[in-house]
UniProtKB/Swiss-Prot annotation:
Membrane topology, record value: Multi-pass membrane protein
MF-aspect GO terms: G protein-coupled receptor activity; olfactory receptor activity
Transmembrane segments: 27-47, 58-78, 102-122, 148-168, 172-192, 201-221, 244-264
Family from the record: Belongs to the G-protein coupled receptor 1 family.
Name of this protein: Olfactory receptor 10AC1
Spans within the Cytoplasmic topological domain: 48-57, 123-147, 193-200, 265-325
Species in which this protein is naturally found: Homo sapiens (Human)
């Protein structure tokens, strides 16, 4: 008799998920559900708060896009994982069709790539705001923000389509059991019949475009910011700006660090359990923390959130300094 991984899904795959840990399924379900609801609520609240502002600074377009990306990002992966964890019949793996798997991978890469470019654009915004404050309004215009936001999405989409086509043109034979809880690139590469380094070239190219180039821009922007802060004579202002940038960098490194460790390594070092652990952080913790930290360090956003929640303090002035973002 054929094994389930070979015979039950002839035109698709089986997502193993966390089926080898049946005793942890209820705990994982409750934990993921709580984080997922917090992520949805936090990002939706940011979108509503920005939409409620009578006048919005151009940079807030980036924040709205970041929240929207994280919202979609978590919806691509987490709901299906929750269903799989709550379904007793999926103890050996959850079936997913070939096209559904390709679509999930493409959307995951597109949204993740758009976020990588967006974080670089936001780093450039902070560079202009801190290093050239008098020219900020002339440089960072609503038109520039809109063009950068659109470019981030289009570049992420272009890379994701090319990578998805390359991965799903590989021959898959033998077991169709994906050792992951979603259709991840490394898990799919592990199932490919061939073991040529050429199979990994599309992933390497995508990593160069999505990870290396934006990270260089981010490091250059923050390097210039650090140099400018050292020349700042006001200790209070320098400390406040430095703490804000440190938080932004921490979230950025969490995003890039997980992605780099997961994808910038040879196929021979593939570790399913480690990849799934990192993916849990990458798909659940980062979408929760990233928009909140970027938003709550800005007075304009916190004032809008207070208005939405009905907790605005008497005498609290709306608006704030963009350099706090």
């Amino acid at each position: 008799m054929d094994s389930p991984s070979n015979a039950t899904v002839p035109c698709g795959f089986l997502l193993q998920g966390f089926s080898e840990f049946p005793h942890l399924r209820p705990v994982l379900f409750l934990l993921l559900l709580g984080v997922h609801l917090a992520t949805l609520g936090g990002n939706l609240l940011i979108l509503v708060a920005v939409a409620s502002m009578p006048s919005r600074q151009p940079m807030l377009l980036f924040l709205c896009q970041l929240s929207a990306i994280e919202l979609c990002y978590t919806l691509v992966v987490v709901p299906r994982s929750l269903v799989d964890l709550s379904t007793p019949g999926h103890r050996r793996g959850s079936p997913i069709s070939f096209l559904s798997c390709a679509f999930q991978m493409q959307m995951f890469v597109a949204l993740g790539g758009a976020e990588c470019f967006l974080l670089a654009a936001m780093a450039y915004d902070r560079y202009v705001a801190i290093c050239h404050p008098l020219r900020y309004a002339a440089v960072v215009t609503p038109g520039l923000c809109a063009r950068l936001a659109l470019a981030c999405c289009l570049r992420g989409l272009a890379v994701s389509v090319g990578l998805t086509v390359a991965i799903f043109h590989l021959p898959f034979c033998g077991s169709r059991l994906l050792l992951h809880f979603f259709c991840d690139i490394t898990a799919l590469l592990h199932l490919a019949c061939t073991r040529s380094y050429a199979d990994e070239l599309p992933l390497l190219g995508a990593c160069l475009v999505l990870l290396l180039l934006p990270s260089v821009l981010i490091l250059a922007s923050y390097g210039a910011i650090a140099a400018a802060l050292r020349r700042l004579r006001c200790p209070k202002g320098r400390g406040k700006a430095a703490s804000t940038c440190a938080l932004h960098l921490a979230v950025t490194f969490l995003h890039y660090g997980c992605a780099t460790f997961m994808y910038v390594r040879p196929r021979a070092s593939y570790s399913p359990r480690l990849d799934r652990t990192l993916a849990l952080v990458y798909t659940n913790v980062t979408p929760l923390l990233c928009p909140l930290i970027y938003s709550l360090r800005n007075r304009e956003i916190t004032a809008a959130l207070s208005r939405v929640l009905g907790r605005r303090r008497p005498g609290q002035a709306p608006g704030g300094d963009l350099r706090e973002l």
